[in-house]
């Protein structure tokens, strides 16, 4: 009986990792389990740092002795016992790949199957003339030549050298020794017993004359013999020159290999590597398979609206390059160009001469020496400087490769077709379209029986994997999408789809908020996908705040009651039905007892708008939209509808550039913005990490660390020892531990496994040396302070206003539970974003700021969302404007204004389908076909 209990459940006894308070918990196996609770309550600690970490540790124990030698250094989770634990796989929100060669297709392995499909049943076409490519046997070639016009005089040639540099004396000598008498050299027939001199730096073509013969039945054997000899001599290729009495001769190309006879081009046999952009066999030779190339961007080199003598040409004046600056002044003087003018005010001839040069010799002085140099033009000067200095990355832009048009492959690979489509077509179509294409067997009915047998298992694998992506709400993505541009939520759902495709059973999957970035419309799709994963005999533990996901769980574990030191307890575990009868925070929001409501603020009396015109990017075509200022505005819409394209890729960079450079014009790259005079800055608070090293933490990022170091340096003991504030920095020598260089951890390279961080055995993770730690404030060392939660530190430093005021802003955004010295790499995207928000709150406010946030509710419990809403509205109350990309209905329904994009993702999106107050968008949902409006209407009932 005891054995059955262990097999049916995962039993955790005495979990004390981080803030967990000796937790005992039984989790049913093979079920859909949701962990919920306030941010910082301990959900992720229990799911990832305890269950998953122990699963990984046990896996390592099963490895070789080489791997096991590190196990004593890899910390075991602080837990007494875990029974019934199965192999664990974590699917978190960390970006899938930073590799520019990774795409959605490569991550999911769909691209591998596409490569196989194209290699096995693809039809080759000539990339030049678009004619089908075919191959011929020797007998086919003989037959075709014998059927040429009767009595035609022909020369059968064996191509030896094709358009290559060299003198080729050895080749010519070899032909002589083999008995050849004549050859065509660069199109002219020569005798091989005569002296032939070829220039080794020029390209040459050499063709051996195998035979000269007349087409008739008597010469059939002679023709066959000559053809076989020519094919052997030139490795499967030959040329036939048909002589005509009163007209130029005609050339015909024949090949045993695949070739275009019209263009006289041969092609290699197709193999999967022919379609790999990571292999020389398939990669575009221009961009080496990246699809993009870096080149100088004129708009970054030159500001056309700034006077020439005030730094308009950044590449010359931006780096204080006096040599080029003096040459530039000499050029302007010689050509009569007034440097007080802007580039736009010069005539066309002057502009061209400035940019591209005009070959004139320029006299100028450099370091008191007269010099004379030709003016090459700004662009050539920039290239020269880049080659010399390699520091002009600020003036470079990544642009689509002109050779492969961004498709990464060689022209010969891109011209191959399957079912009438090229590889580029499959990579650029939305996944939804790709799924429907492969789901229709009539597209492949043209294949013969042998090809169908080959293609069938490949098509099955492609269809399954594409369906899983479509099923998790990613139908708007493309298989060619760069993995670096994928959000954390999208990345996680891609890996969920991949796991379903792997068919594993008996696995414990630990997921971190898979609903992030999903519109309410797609949430049920995701839940069904998770169910499919669970039904394969797996246990799912999902850390989640989404109402629908919680309501569809088999078992819910609520960690709380609050965050940080006030959390770490299991306040509820059981079914959803029992949860709704409970009276703690999560249950109160789920059963409607508590609601998230906006604070009461007076709306602005004056109404101003920011209008964006002529937006053309990705799926947005010629869009213009008005955004109200001094309000909380939500940009909504299904995934892939164009929200990020409009706000993050268009409004944000354009507005920042125009404001930062005080542009006279209000347009940039064709996009026009009206209403910028009502703003003085635009701030984007994203979810990127606040730092990439263990020495980055909330204290250093917000600036509170500087004040704390000053306070420690002011202590009597510190003054006696001559310690300055820098003594208490772990970024410089002096006070830090030199063994770990202030990291607190040491990285151990595992070679065949990911590197492992272990605590420094010298400072025990304190980051400082013993002498520094002897200095105390109110009995606490600098390491003790960094180990405090923000809430504890706020109480500790209550009498130090400069420190307390910065800590208060962190508490205001719901981050009282994080520690001051918490490693930046361990913070979630949502936490990093709120730390940035706290930093902004601590600055002096001008009341003319536009804040842009992308899904700030990421990782937030209902209680935390309520808290965040108050902060956002408080910034608006000060006269600022708040623009939020969001799917969370609790934020959307409490916004002042909504701009809804859609109606769907990808090509079916890119339009503003609804705008107005939440009530207006909800009331007009049937007319506008707004999915957001429909869900909003249910929420506002």
Show where each model-derived region lies.
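Conserved phosphate-binding elements of NTP-dependent enzyme cores
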Residues: 1-941
């Amino acid at each position: 009986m005891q054995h059955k209990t262990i097999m049916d459940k995962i039993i955790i006894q005495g979990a004390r990792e981080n803030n967990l308070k000796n937790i005992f918990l039984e989790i049913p196996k093979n079920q859909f389990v949701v962990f919920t609770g306030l941010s910082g309550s301990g959900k992720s600690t229990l799911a990832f740092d305890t269950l998953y970490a122990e699963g990984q540790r046990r896996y390592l124990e099963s490895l070789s002795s080489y791997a096991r030698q590190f196990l004593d250094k890899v910390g075991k989770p602080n837990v007494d016992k875990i029974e019934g634990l199965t192999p664990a796989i974590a699917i978190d929100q960390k970006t899938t790949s930073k590799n520019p060669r990774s795409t959605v297709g490569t991550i999911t392995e769909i691209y591998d199957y596409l490569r196989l499909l194209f290699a096995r049943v693809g039809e080759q076409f000539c990339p030049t003339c678009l004619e089908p490519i075919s191959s011929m046997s020797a007998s086919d070639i003989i037959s075709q030549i014998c059927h040429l016009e009767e009595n035609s005089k022909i020369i059968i040639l064996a191509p030896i050298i094709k358009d290559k540099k060299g003198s080729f004396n050895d080749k010519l000598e070899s032909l002589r020794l083999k008995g050849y008498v004549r050859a065509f050299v660069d199109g002219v027939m020569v005798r091989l017993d005569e002296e032939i001199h070829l220039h080794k730096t020029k390209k040459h073509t050499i063709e051996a004359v195998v035979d000269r013969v007349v087409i008739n039945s008597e010469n059939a054997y002679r023709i066959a013999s000559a053809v076989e000899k020519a094919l052997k001599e030139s490795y499967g290729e030959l040329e036939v020159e048909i002589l005509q009495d009163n007209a130029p001769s005609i050339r015909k190309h024949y090949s045993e290999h695949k070739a275009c006879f019209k263009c006289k081009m041969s092609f290699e046999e197709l193999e999967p590597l022919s379609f790999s952009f990571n292999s020389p066999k398939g990669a575009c030779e221009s961009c080496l398979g990246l699809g993009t190339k870096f080149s100088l961007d004129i708009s970054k080199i030159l500001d056309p609206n700034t006077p020439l003598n005030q730094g308009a040409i950044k590449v010359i004046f931006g780096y204080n390059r006096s040599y080029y600056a003096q040459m530039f002044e000499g050029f302007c003087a010689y050509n009569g160009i007034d440097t007080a003018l802007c580039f736009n005010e010069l005539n066309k001839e002057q502009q061209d001469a400035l940019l591209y040069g005009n070959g004139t010799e320029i006299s100028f002085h450099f370091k008191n020496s007269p010099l004379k140099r030709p003016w090459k033009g700004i662009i050539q000067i920039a290239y020269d400087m880049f080659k010399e200095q390699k520091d002009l990355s600020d003036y470079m832009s990544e642009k689509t490769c002109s050779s492969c048009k961004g498709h990464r492959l060689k022209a010969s690979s891109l011209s191959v077709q399957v079912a009438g489509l090229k590889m580029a077509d499959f990579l650029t179509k939305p996944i939804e379209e790709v799924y429907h294409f492969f789901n229709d067997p009539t597209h492949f009915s043209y294949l013969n029986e042998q090809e169908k047998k080959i293609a069938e298992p490949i098509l099955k694998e492609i269809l399954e994997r594409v369906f899983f992506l479509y099923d998790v709400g990613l139908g708007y993505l493309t298989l060619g999408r760069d993995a670096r541009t994928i959000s954390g939520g999208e990345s996680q759902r891609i890996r969920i789809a991949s796991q379903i495709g792997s068919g594993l059973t008996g696995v414990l999957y630990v997921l971190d908020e898979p609903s992030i970035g999903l519109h309410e419309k797609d949430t049920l799709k995701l839940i069904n996908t998770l169910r499919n994963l669970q039904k394969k005999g797996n246990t799912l533990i999902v850390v989640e705040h989404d109402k629908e996901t919680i309501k569809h769980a088999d078992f819910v574990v609520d960690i709380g009651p609050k965050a940080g030191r006030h959390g770490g307890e299991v306040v509820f575990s059981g079914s959803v039905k029992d949860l709704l009868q409970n009276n703690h925070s999560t249950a109160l929001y789920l059963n409607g007892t508590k609601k998230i409501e906006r604070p009461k603020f007076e709306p602005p009396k004056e109404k101003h708008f920011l209008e964006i015109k002529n937006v053309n990017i990705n799926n947005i075509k010629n869009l213009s939209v008005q955004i109200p200022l001094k309000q909380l505005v939500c940009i909504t819409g299904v995934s892939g509808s164009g929200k990020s394209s409009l706000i993050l890729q268009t409004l944000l960079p354009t507005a920042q550039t125009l404001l930062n450079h005080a542009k006279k014009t209000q347009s940039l790259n064709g996009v026009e913005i009206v209403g910028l005079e009502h703003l003085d800055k635009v701030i984007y608070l994203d979810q990127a990490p606040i730092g990439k090293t263990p020495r980055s933490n909330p204290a250093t990022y917000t600036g509170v660390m500087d004040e704390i170091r000053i306070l420690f340096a002011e202590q009597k003991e510190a003054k006696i020892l001559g310690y300055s504030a820098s003594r208490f920095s772990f970024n410089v020598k002096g006070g830090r531990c030199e063994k770990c260089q202030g990291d607190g951890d040491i990285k151990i390279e595992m070679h065949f496994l990911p590197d492992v961080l272990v605590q420094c055995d010298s400072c025990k993770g304190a980051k400082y040396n013993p002498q520094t730690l002897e200095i105390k404030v109110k009995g606490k060392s600098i390491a003790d302070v960094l180990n405090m939660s923000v809430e504890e530190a706020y109480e500790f430093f209550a009498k130090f206003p400069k420190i307390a005021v910065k800590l208060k802003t962190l508490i205001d955004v719901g981050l009282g539970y994080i520690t001051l010295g918490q490693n930046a790499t361990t913070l979630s995207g949502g936490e990093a974003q709120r730390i940035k928000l706290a930093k902004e709150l601590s600055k002096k406010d001008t009341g003319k700021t536009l804040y842009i946030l992308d899904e700030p509710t990421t990782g937030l419990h209902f209680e935390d969302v309520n808290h965040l809403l108050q902060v956002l509205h408080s910034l608006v109350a000060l006269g600022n404007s708040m623009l939020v990309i969001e799917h969370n209905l609790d934020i959307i329904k409490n916004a002042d204004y909504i701009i809804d994009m859609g109606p769907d993702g990808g090509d079916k999106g890119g339009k503003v389908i609804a705008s107005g107050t939440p009530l207006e968008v909800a009331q007009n949902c049937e007319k506008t076909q707004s999915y957001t409006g429909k869900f909003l209407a249910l929420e506002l009932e």
